[in-house]
């Protein structure tokens, strides 16, 4: 009971204290609060409530009242005044879109916009430094527009808006470089995309124009994403995406009008937009009118927020031009101030406009034109020609005019050319000439700022080859050749671009920095309407001051061959029909040249090809290189996959037919400076297929992005079909695409030069150090050439595929690149590949195996054949089967011979020992006899008597021997004393016994 009493007392006390506090607050005034709408309920209704301003405390706020329905909105030029809940017109100096908001000021990032830089690589490499590598990537405000990143990070510009009803978002953009992927998509508050993913890819801009993109929005929360992802290899820098004038429609109401930004004004109430202040005026924010500058000393550009002081005139403020030829065919150099003129001549440091030069003779007409007695040159009529110095003449019989354009004299701009100036950030140079004629050349103009694009266009309706080569296949249709130079101290660039059938402009080549006098040729293979564009930019950095006005590009001559609407500067021999009716020309069949004597078509000799731009004379048929033959049309040479050559007095034959299919090498991975993983994909067609180029590389950007871009299937800008080509592959897990990205396809080899075991052919050399080898068999080198030239490869690209025998690698084997050049090239112009496979071994011959004969067993002998210890051959002759032949065994006779030999040896040894012992005894007896005889040499010898004396016994037996012993015979032979024959006497004396 006590607890309840205490609680009740506490409540009563609080009420008393609150009432006392409210009594002490002042009554709310209109300036102390503002009105807001509550959130809409399920019925689409809401309430208007009064909310105290920050820092204000008052009592007596107005009671809530029912507000306008949630879908209510005011018209353009009006805003909803919540206090009265009525639409009111915007005051002068402000504007309103009614149901929309607009962002056209980009001096800083507008409120509500945010930047998010991410790295969409999903693999593990470089995971530690990826977040930091993109921390400096963002969208950058540039005043009138906002600029995307130009690296290979993924950066999103995000803005969230809540719509009470369905609306739309639109923006202007400039998107020129397909090396950046540009997406615009919308998510709801659950981070779910609200439209088809195939619609999120933004189309490339046409010819540097600002394009408009609009997408419908649903009611509710819409999170808008402008996302760019760079696909950059090496040191390449992409052109960023530019966005301006973002407009969002569908906002339920606008509670206030937007002020006009500096440089604009609105002079009427209820304006839906602001007007730009004209030149030499300025305005502040929320201006009702523009204020004029003091024009004698000040100036301003369109849309200026202040006036600038006019500087003294310098050489940067004037330019010179050549006047058109007058009726006397005279011209002169005159000087003019750059318009609009912003400098002051009366200042002490100012220069004066130089006087005009003396009149000079006009340069002659360009080839194909003639002077008609007026100040202009006229084109020669059809069927006639002129060198520009003489009247037009009719081509002789048996000849036809050479059509084209050759511009080398620049007194006036030709009729099929135009010039303009363009800047993405301002309109200072709009209406200016981007290029100026200068007699023997045409040069870039002054422009408004240093980052202007100075544009020169040449329109060609189509291309048609001469009549004599109309039947040729695979021949070029025409060429565009221009001679130029860049005179720069800055980072200037001259771009050469091509637009086919007025679809989109693609960059062909760029020439950065200072370039000396040089020539560039672009070959045309497809008949279409072309717009060739030269665009010169002094620097890509926007600057208020002019620092590089003296940087210029000069084009001395432009030559276009085989143009349909061209003129003729000469005539060429053409082929005549068999009946030679009149002088009508007939087309030669494919692979035929025009004989100089008869002007008839004759087929090129075997294994020669016809030059694409010269068919007159037998010398137009060029012999094919070693190991190659011409195709049926004599338009190119190719290898039949059969190669034969002599090495160290040995003829080696190869058969590469099993390698004739298109081979693929995926080399990598490599990584950009930001860590993007990419691969180099090479497709190569080695030989065969009748000379048809089978290697195809395709840019699948359209497949990846789903862009609806019209493109012919044979458009060379999307598909490269040749002998060897290269593409840059970014795996699907690298940037979050649904499939791997293939881009930057390059033609590396469109002409086959020959195959040889030598290390060089027609100026292309492969060093032995590139692919070291210890084999006795040298590599077989296939030499290719790409005729397309670039600024870095003035002679075109060259490719060498070295075929190396490796019996351990069966089938297709392995293809590798030089160890020191992982991209197959070290200079970007010469590419080298090593193809190791057993199929690259020479065909086997009889010298590649040896014969081994077995022992004779049971009257039979087997002969086996085995490959040499290191088999370096394939296919060819087969290893012979085992051979069995009859034989006679020699085991028995060998045993008999051994027995007889052993017996004979023992017998000889025994006889030798016997006779030697007997000879020793005889020598002993003889020596004793000699000693006895010497002791009695003073005594008379006893008379020899054959009779037996009295008293003596017949005991002595005398034996006479005239034969030599075996040992003595051997001695006599050794001493060659055959005349001394000793008599052996054996005595038996009783006297000796008595002694």
UniProtKB/Swiss-Prot annotation:
One of its GO terms (molecular function) is BMP receptor binding. Gene3D superfamilies: Tumor Necrosis Factor Receptor, subunit A, domain 2 (2.10.50.10). Functions as a regulator of the BMP signaling pathway and is involved in epidermal differentiation. Glycans are attached at residues 24, 136, 245, 372, 527, 649, 683, 700, 758, 883. Induction: Expression is down-regulated by ras. It is found in: Cell membrane. Its main location: membrane. GO terms for biological process: negative regulation of nervous system development; positive regulation of BMP signaling pathway; positive regulation of epidermis development. Disulfide bonds join 641-687, 697-725, 793-829, 805-841. Residues 917-995 are cytoplasmic. Disruption phenotype: Morpholino knockdown induces severe developmental defects including dorsal open phenotype and the reduction of head and tail structures at the tailbud stage. InterPro entries: Elapor1-like_3rd, Elapor1/2, Elapor1/2_C, Elapor1/2_GBD, Elapor1/2_MRH, Elapor1/2_TNFR-like, Growth_fac_rcpt_cys_sf, Man6P_isomerase_rcpt-bd_dom_sf. Expressed in the animal half of the embryo during gastrulation, becoming restricted to the ventral ectoderm at stage 12.5. At the neurula stage, expressed in the anterior ectoderm surrounding the neural plate, and weakly in the epidermis. Expression is especially high in the presumptive hatching gland and cement gland regions. Surprisingly, by the tailbud stage (stage 22), expression is limited to the hatching gland and is not seen in the cement gland. Conversely, in tadpoles expressed broadly in the head, heart and fin. Residues 1-21 form the signal peptide. It is a single-pass type I membrane protein. Keywords: Cell membrane, Disulfide bond, Glycoprotein, Membrane, Signal, Transmembrane, Transmembrane helix. Residues 639-843 form the MRH domain. The gene is elapor2. The chain crosses the membrane at residues 896-916. Belongs to the ELAPOR family. Residues 22-895 are extracellular. This is Endosome/lysosome-associated apoptosis and autophagy regulator family member 2. GO terms for cellular component: membrane; plasma membrane.
């Amino acid at each position: 009971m006590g607890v309840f009493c205490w609680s009740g007392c506490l409540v009563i006390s609080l009420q008393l204290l609150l009432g006392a506090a409210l009594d002490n607050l002042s009554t709310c005034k209109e300036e102390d609060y503002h009105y807001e709408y509550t959130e809409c309920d399920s019925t689409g209704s809401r309430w208007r409530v009064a909310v105290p301003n920050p820092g204000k405390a008052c009592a007596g706020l107005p009671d809530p009242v029912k507000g306008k329905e949630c879908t209510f909105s005011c018209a353009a030029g009006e805003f909803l005044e919540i206090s009265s809940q009525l639409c009111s017109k915007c005051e002068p100096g402000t504007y309103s879109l009614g149901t929309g908001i607009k962002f056209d000021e980009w001096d800083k990032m507008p409120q509500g916009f945010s930047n998010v830089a991410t790295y969409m690589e999903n693999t593990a490499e470089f995971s530690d430094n990826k977040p930091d590598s993109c921390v400096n990537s963002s969208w950058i405000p540039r005043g009138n527009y906002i600029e995307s990143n130009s690296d290979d990070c993924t950066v999103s510009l995000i803005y969230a808006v809540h719509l009470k009803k369905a609306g739309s978002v639109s923006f202007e953009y400039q998107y020129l470089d397909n090396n950046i992927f540009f997406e615009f998509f919308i998510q709801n508050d659950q981070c779910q995309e609200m439209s088809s993913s195939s619609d999120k890819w933004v189309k490339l801009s046409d010819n540097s124009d600002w394009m408009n993109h609009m997408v419908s929005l649903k009611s509710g929360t819409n999170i808008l994403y402008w996302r760019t992802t760079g696909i950059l290899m090496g040191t390449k820098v992409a052109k960023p995406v530019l966005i301006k004038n973002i407009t969002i429609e569908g906002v339920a109401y606008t509670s206030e009008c937007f002020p006009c930004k500096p440089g604009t004004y609105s002079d009427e109430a209820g304006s839906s937009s602001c007007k730009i202040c004209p030149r030499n005026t300025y305005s502040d924010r929320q201006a009702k009118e523009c204020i004029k500058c003091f024009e004698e000393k000040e100036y301003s550009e369109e849309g200026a927020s202040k006036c600038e002081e006019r500087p003294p005139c310098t050489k940067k403020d004037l330019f010179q031009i050549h006047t058109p030829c007058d009726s006397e065919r005279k011209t002169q150099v005159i000087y003019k101030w750059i318009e609009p003129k912003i400098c002051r001549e009366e200042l002490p440091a100012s220069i004066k406009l130089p006087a005009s030069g003396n009149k000079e003779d006009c340069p002659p007409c360009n080839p194909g034109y003639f002077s008609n007695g007026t100040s202009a040159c006229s084109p020669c009529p059809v069927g006639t020609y002129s060198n520009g110095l003489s009247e037009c003449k009719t081509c002789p019989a048996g000849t036809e005019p050479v059509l084209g354009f050759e511009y080398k004299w620049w007194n006036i701009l030709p009729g099929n050319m135009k010039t303009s100036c363009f800047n993405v950030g301002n309109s200072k140079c709009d209406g200016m000439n981007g290029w100026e004629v200068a007699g023997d050349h045409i040069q870039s103009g002054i422009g408004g700022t240093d980052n202007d694009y100075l544009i020169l266009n040449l329109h060609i309706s189509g291309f048609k080859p001469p009549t004599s080569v109309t039947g040729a296949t695979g021949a070029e249709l025409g060429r565009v050749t221009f001679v130029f130079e860049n005179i720069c101290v800055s980072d200037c660039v001259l771009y050469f671009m091509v637009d086919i059938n007025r679809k989109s402009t693609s960059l062909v080549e760029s020439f950065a920095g200072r370039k000396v006098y040089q020539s560039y040729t672009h070959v045309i293979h497809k008949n279409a309407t072309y717009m060739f564009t030269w665009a010169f930019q002094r620097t890509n950095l926007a600057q208020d001051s002019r620092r590089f006005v003296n940087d210029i590009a000069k084009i001395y001559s432009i030559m276009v061959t085989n143009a349909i609407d061209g003129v003729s500067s000469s005539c060429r021999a053409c082929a005549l029909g068999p009946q030679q009716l009149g002088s009508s020309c007939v087309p030669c069949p494919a692979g035929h040249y025009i004989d100089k004597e008869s002007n008839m078509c004759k087929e090129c000799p075997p294994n020669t090809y016809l030059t694409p731009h010269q068919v007159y004379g037998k010398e137009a048929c060029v012999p094919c290189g070693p190991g190659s033959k011409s195709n049926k049309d004599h338009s190119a040479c190719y290898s039949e996959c059969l190669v034969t050559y002599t090495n160290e007095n040995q003829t080696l034959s190869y058969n590469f037919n099993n390698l004739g299919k298109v081979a693929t090498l995926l080399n990598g991975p490599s990584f950009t400076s930001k860590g993007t993983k990419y691969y180099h994909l090479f497709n190569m067609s080695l030989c065969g297929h009748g000379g048809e180029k089978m290697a195809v590389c395709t840019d699948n950007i359209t497949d990846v992005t789903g862009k609806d871009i019209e493109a012919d299937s044979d458009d060379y800008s999307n598909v490269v079909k040749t002998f060897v080509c290269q593409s840059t592959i970014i795996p699907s897990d690298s940037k979050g695409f649904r499939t791997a990205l293939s881009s930057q396809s390059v033609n590396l080899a469109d002409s086959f030069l020959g195959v040889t075991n030598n290390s060089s052919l027609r100026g292309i050399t492969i060093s032995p150090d590139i692919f070291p080898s210890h084999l006795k068999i040298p590599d077989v080198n296939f030499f290719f050439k790409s005729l397309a030239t670039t600024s870095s490869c003035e002679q075109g690209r060259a490719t060498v595929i070295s075929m190396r025998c490796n019996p351990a690698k069966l089938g297709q084997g392995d293809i590798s690149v030089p160890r020191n050049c992982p991209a197959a090239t070290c200079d970007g112009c010469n590419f080298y590949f090593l193809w190791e496979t057993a199929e690259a071994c020479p065909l086997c011959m009889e010298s590649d195996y040896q014969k081994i004969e077995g022992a004779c067993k049971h009257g039979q002998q087997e002969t086996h054949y085995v490959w040499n210890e290191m088999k370096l051959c394939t296919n060819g002759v087969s290893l012979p089967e085992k051979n069995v032949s009859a034989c006679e065994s020699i085991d028995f006779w060998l045993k008999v011979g051994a027995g007889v030999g052993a017996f004979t040896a023992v017998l000889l040894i025994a006889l030798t020992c016997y006779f030697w012992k007997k000879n020793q005894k005889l020598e002993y007896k003889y020596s004793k006899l000699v000693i006895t005889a010497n002791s009695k040499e003073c005594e008379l010898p006893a008379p020899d008597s054959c009779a037996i004396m009295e008293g003596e016994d017949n005991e002595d037996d005398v034996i006479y021997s005239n034969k030599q012993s075996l040992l003595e015979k051997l001695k006599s032979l050794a001493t060659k004393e055959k005349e001394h024959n000793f008599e052996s006497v054996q005595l038996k004396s009783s006297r000796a016994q008595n002694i």
